[in-house]
Regions:
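C-terminal output helix
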Residues: 111-123
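Residue-level signal for the "D+5" position in two-component response regulator receiver
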Residues: 34, 59-62
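Acidic catalytic/metal-coordinating carboxylates
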Residues: 37-40, 63-69
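Two-component/phosphorelay signaling modules centered on CheY-like receiver
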Residues: 15-33, 126
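The feature encodes the CheY-like receiver
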Residues: 60, 69, 78, 90
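Hydrophobic/aromatic residues positioned on beta-strands within the core alpha/beta folds
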Residues: 85-86
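Alpha4 helix (beta4-alpha4-beta5 surface) of REC/receiver domains from two-component response regulators
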Residues: 66, 89-108, 121
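Active-site beta3 strand of CheY-like receiver
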Residues: 48-54, 59
Length: 129
């Protein structure tokens, strides 16, 4: 089976996290683009048309849910799968978090820190579709 490189946009305000995720995805053979703010994520998604967006819940300027909802309303980006990344905390209301992400149009939600085999499986699911 031939592995063709896909374009993935990582939208996260944490430089260190973006760097770690970028390295992991590049190791899988894919091309990575990055955005640190909600507006930057929208602009890059519209210009590069990635095959997948890894979207943090909290971005400067707007939430990941708001960015996702805007992308899903846009004709040119509505079919790009979005995986919401949320930090796992004991104070987190898991059901509410999942509900908000899915209502915004996200296909999936992953909690940080990622379990790497799960992250790899999610990436493969959306990149092979």
């Amino acid at each position: 089976m031939q592995n063709t490189a896909k374009k993935i946009l990582i939208a996260d305000s944490n430089d260190a996290f973006r760097g770690s995720l970028r390295a992991f995805i590049q190791e899988m053979g894919h091309e990575v683009f990055e955005a640190a703010t909600g507006q930057e994520a929208i602009e890059k998604a519209c210009s590069i048309h990635p095959q997948l967006i890894m979207m943090d819940v909290r971005l400067a300027g707007m939430t990941g849910d708001e960015v996702t909802a805007r992308l899903k309303r846009n004709q040119s980006t509505r079919n790009i799968p979005v995986v919401i990344n949320a930090a796992w905390t004991m104070a987190c209301n898991v059901e509410e978090r999942i509900h908000r992400a899915l209502n915004a149009g996200a296909e999936e939600i992953l909690y940080k820190p990622f379990h790497l085999p799960m992250l790899r499986a999610v990436l493969r699911t959306y990149l092979l579709a």
